[in-house]
From Swiss-Prot:
Keywords of the record: Lyase, Magnesium, Metal-binding
Family stated for the protein in its record: Belongs to the mandelate racemase/muconate lactonizing enzyme family. MenC type 1 subfamily.
Organism of provenance: Synechocystis sp. (strain ATCC 27184 / PCC 6803 / Kazusa)
Pfam family, one: MR_MLE_C
Protein name in UniProt: o-succinylbenzoate synthase
Length: 320
């Protein structure tokens, strides 16, 4: 019979360093839970529940109810059975157990990874570049699908001209484009591939997750790579798109994809061009996700995490 772990958990609540504006809306605060497991020998491991309900995960209230329902105890068998209904809880308890058993999920230093700088949305990106002439990254992401296409297209042209030659640009629509607008973006990006200057790396999630067939057609019709994000935010979705033959990139938000050991095992047997991405978690989940990225992130592609020079939030009990 499995010996239960003792469970402690607490909430956290902090403002994002810069509000994030996407096709999903405005996001200003990060709320979540930290769980701690202790076995009968005193070994401890921590994990983080960082919900992203607009990506289809459980919300914070459901995660809190689950943690309370445990009444301070959980067995390894229960951790295995958390399942897809509570993927963020699955990640937290799975990574805490992994850390407890191995001493640390991080087997290699993630310092060899390169990082991606998220630029402010809209015209604020130009102000950012003007006030930060010494850029600390060589890969940049800019959100689109938030405003009018013509305005964003013109802003992107200015942005492209101001970024240093040789850097990489990722455009992220968060599923906010129509097929027609996505085609116009891809036509523009394909044309830029022939020019010197910054290089477009990919267009991320141009269409809503339900429009998979249309995204397959876009991937076939244009040279610019398409990366799926909202469409592969669970392991079940990832496996389904892999079986269907998706030839583009996969953005993996591991902190919302369930038990990390299960994901790690799947990636061992399914080689895919994966790029690991942040959900604006604290240092706890960040380190655990970057440990997976160290193994499985596509070589020569930056992870979708802020550069190390930016402040990384440590998890402290919520006082709000």
């Amino acid at each position: 019979m499995d010996k239960p772990y003792h469970v402690k958990f607490y909430s956290y609540n902090f403002p994002l360093p810069k509000p994030v504006v996407t096709a999903h809306g405005h996001w200003q605060r990060r709320r979540g839970l930290i769980v701690e497991l202790t076995d009968q020998r005193g070994n401890r491991g921590r994990g983080e529940i960082a919900p992203l309900p607009w990506f289809g995960t459980e919300d914070l209230a459901s995660a809190t109810d689950f943690c309370r329902s445990l009444k301070g105890r959980i067995t390894p068998a229960q951790i295995e059975k958390i399942g897809d209904r509570l993927p963020c809880c699955g990640f937290a308890f799975g990574s805490a157990e992994w850390e407890l058993e191995s001493g640390s999920v991080i087997e290699n230093s993630p310092n060899s990874l390169s990082y991606c700088q998220l630029l402010p949305t809209g015209e604020a990106a130009l102000d950012y570049l003007a006030s930060n002439p010494q850029l600390g990254a060589s890969t940049f992401k800019w959100k689109i699908g938030v405003g009018d296409f013509a305005v964003e297209r013109d802003l992107y042209g200015q942005l492209w001209r101001r970024l240093p030659e040789g850097c990489q640009i990722r455009l992220d629509a968060n599923g906010g484009l129509s097929v027609d607008i996505a085609q116009q973006w891809l036509t523009l990006l394909d044309r830029q591939r022939e020019n010197s200057g910054p290089k477009i790396q990919y267009l991320e999630q141009p269409l809503p997750p339900g429009e998979i067939d249309e995204m397959f057609r876009l991937q076939e019709d244009f040279a610019t790579s398409i990366a799926l994000d909202e469409a592969v935010c669970s392991l079940a979705q990832l496996a389904q798109l892999y079986d269907k033959g998706w030839s583009g990139l996969y953005i993996l938000k591991a902190a919302i994809m369930g038990n990390p050991r299960v994901l790690n095992h799947w990636l061992k047997t399914h080689p895919i061009p994966a790029i690991f991405s942040s959900v604006f978690e604290t240092a706890i989940a960040r380190g655990q996700v970057l440990a997976l990225a160290q193994k499985w992130n596509l070589p020569d592609h930056a992870v979708g995490f802020a550069p190390l020079r930016e402040p990384i939030t440590e998890a402290t009990p919520d006082s709000v």
